[in-house]
């Protein structure tokens, strides 16, 4: 199998990511994070960014092999310390209000078998060191977009029955192009129409200002409180300079932050989670008074326990997102082992930090004010998928009356 018009569609994809994703403007700095395997796409992105007037494009290359070798052989004292040059680079990007484009294509199991203690220590150290960048991103001080590219090892996991490596990669690129609307006659217009539909759902939810959400499904009975003056967001966002951008491509979600002090019940994951180079399945979480009191996983149990119990703020939630089961990604029937895609096939929750934009006036609040408003503060943010065609969700008003939001996994409003 050879994907028809691949080069033409890859060029369209690069243009969409640069012009509509991060929305590069004259004078901008762009930081591109991308795997060495995606050299062709990287070059197209760099070319397009400079064509739109970028003053500097910084490419941060990633390599699964190099990363795995580091974790296998580097001593713990090196892994749990972040080098000064990385912090200096972060500060440079922040000072220049650099837009960030992350293109994900890694093998979901690249770090399988690596010492969980090393992974946990490194992730914790990076989370603390990169906190200023995370805060800037989660409060939309800068434009940022997360997208994907078809990596070989990733493609082989998604399409294990493909006739060849080439076919697996082609099949994955085909799904990326479909979900990002590259095959549409006018991808930009298609994105505008899609964003308008999601925005209408967010506006309805913002008008209601529910006090809580109640989720029920096999293995799930969970009530999440919502902060006062919470904000539901959808596809598009606006940075501190007043420039629009698309944080996720693809996207099917409408999301906000729960009140991290108000979560009671239990929830079971419905899709695998790829986190820290490990595939985690069968997650079960129990909450009391907003806190995770028990978490288990059928696969990757220790990785999840380390995430929750070894990172500040990781015992509470920072995001709840609504995604209808009939979404195109869900209906494809494909498990992507990639959060960007799998979270857009399913209702999901995020362990850890909330976005400052999830409450009115949040971007002007201090960390202490955000916490007082009910937004979780943490050095991590990890989504896990809980939706299915058997999930019902009710919005609960202040007076206790209920409004059906989801029935059998789809919008009821």
Give the residues covered by each predicted segment:
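Active-site bordering "gate/hinge" segments
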Residues: 1-264, 395, 401-403, 411-413
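Short solvent-exposed loop/turn micro-motifs enriched in small/polar/acidic residues
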Residues: 15, 206-208, 276-279, 313, ...
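A short secondary-structure junction signal
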Residues: 112-115, 155-160, 236-237, 278-281, ...
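Short linear motifs in exposed loops
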Residues: 225, 295-296, 406
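Long, well-ordered mid-to-C-terminal structural blocks that present hydrophobic/aromatic surfaces
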Residues: 256-312
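Active-site lining segments that contact anionic ligands and/or coordinate catalytic metals
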Residues: 262-264, 280-282, 289-292, 315-319, ...
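Dual-mode signal for accessory low-complexity, basic/Gly-rich regions
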Residues: 294-363
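Extended hydrophobic packing segments that form well-structured cores
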Residues: 368-413
């Amino acid at each position: 199998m050879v994907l028809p018009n691949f080069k033409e569609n890859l060029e369209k994809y690069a243009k969409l990511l640069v012009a509509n994703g991060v929305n590069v403007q004259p004078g901008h700095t762009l930081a591109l994070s991308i795997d060495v395997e995606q050299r062709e796409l990287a070059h197209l992105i760099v070319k397009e960014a400079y064509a739109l007037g970028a003053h500097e494009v910084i490419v941060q290359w990633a390599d699964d092999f190099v990363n795995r070798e580091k974790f296998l052989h580097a001593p713990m004292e090196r892994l749990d310390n972040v080098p000064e040059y990385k912090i200096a680079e972060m500060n440079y990007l922040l000072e220049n209000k650099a837009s960030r484009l992350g293109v994900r294509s890694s093998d979901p199991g690249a770090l399988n078998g690596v010492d969980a203690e090393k992974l946990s220590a490194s992730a914790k150290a990076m989370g603390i060191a990169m906190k200023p960048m995370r805060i800037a991103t989660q409060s939309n001080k800068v434009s940022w977009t997360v997208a994907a590219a078809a990596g070989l090892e990733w493609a082989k996991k998604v399409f294990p029955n493909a006739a060849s490596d080439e076919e697996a990669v082609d099949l994955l690129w085909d799904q990326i192009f479909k979900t990002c609307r590259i095959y549409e006659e006018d991808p930009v217009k298609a994105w505008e129409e899609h964003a308008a539909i999601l925005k209408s759902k967010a506006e309805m939810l913002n008008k209601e200002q529910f006090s809580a959400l109640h989720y029920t499904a096999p293995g799930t009975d969970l009530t999440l409180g919502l902060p006062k003056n919470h904000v539901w967001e959808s596809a598009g966002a606006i940075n501190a300079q007043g420039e629009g951008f698309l944080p996720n491509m693809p996207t099917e979600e409408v999301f906000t932050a729960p009140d991290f002090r108000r979560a009671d019940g239990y929830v079971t994951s419905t899709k695998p989670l790829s986190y820290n180079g490990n595939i985690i399945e069968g997650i079960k979480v129990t909450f009391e008074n907003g806190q995770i009191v028990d978490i288990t996983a059928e696969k990757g149990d220790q990785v999840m326990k380390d995430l929750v119990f070894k990172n500040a703020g990781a015992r509470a939630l920072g995001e709840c997102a609504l995604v209808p089961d009939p979404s195109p990604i869900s209906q494809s029937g494909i498990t992507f082992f990639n959060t960007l895609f799998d979270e857009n096939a399913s209702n999901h929750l995020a362990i850890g930090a909330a976005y400052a934009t999830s409450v009115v006036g949040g971007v002007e609040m201090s960390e202490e004010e955000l916490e007082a408003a009910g937004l979780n503060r943490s050095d991590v943010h990890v989504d896990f998928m809980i939706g299915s065609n058997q999930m019902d969700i009710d919005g609960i008003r202040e007076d206790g009356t209920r409004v059906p939001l989801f029935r059998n996994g789809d919008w009821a409003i």
